[in-house]
């Protein structure tokens, strides 16, 4: 075997369609585009979603909802993340100081995910029922 004798396997390569090259090719004259009409023209085709002038589906259906602006300032924190806070009383500012929430956050809710190993006192922070039980079980309190 030599590099100059290498060839692709038989039938693995096919010649490209040569359009408009005479009647004998089977793709002469109209080049497989039929006679006249929009699709026979160069650059002629409708845009995606066009329904022939009928009001398209994406415009017939109603719009709904919007992104809430206040959602940007609300955060949730997991129970096990409170273990990283080295303070007895956990407030919004404490969480910001320890980098658990962004500086622009205005309300926080603690959710019951993971375990809490130490007693902490939450002040001005909302929490789920499961998180409250876990905090009180660890010897902490929710104010």
UniProtKB/Swiss-Prot annotation:
Annotated region Disordered: where?
1-52
Q: Name one GO cellular component term.
A: cytosolic large ribosomal subunit
Going by the entry's taxonomy, the superkingdom of the source organism is recorded as Bacteria
Q: Which UniProt keywords apply?
A: Ribonucleoprotein, Ribosomal protein, RNA-binding, rRNA-binding
According to the UniProt entry, which residue ranges have a biased composition of type Gly residues?
A: 21-31
A single BP term in Gene Ontology: translation
Q: Which GO terms describe its molecular function?
A: rRNA binding; structural constituent of ribosome
Stored InterPro entries: Ribosomal_uL15 (IPR030878), Ribosomal_uL15/eL18 (IPR021131), Ribosomal_uL15/eL18_sf (IPR036227), Ribosomal_uL15_bac-type (IPR005749), Ribosomal_uL15_CS (IPR001196)
Family annotation (SUPFAM superfamilies): Ribosomal proteins L15p and L18e
Disulfide pairs?
A: none
Quaternary structure, per UniProt, is:
Part of the 50S ribosomal subunit.
UniProt function note: Binds to the 23S rRNA.
Q: Which family does it belong to?
A: Belongs to the universal ribosomal protein uL15 family.
Q: What is this protein called?
A: Large ribosomal subunit protein uL15
Q: Which organism is it from?
A: Francisella tularensis subsp. holarctica (strain LVS)
Gene name in the database record: rplO
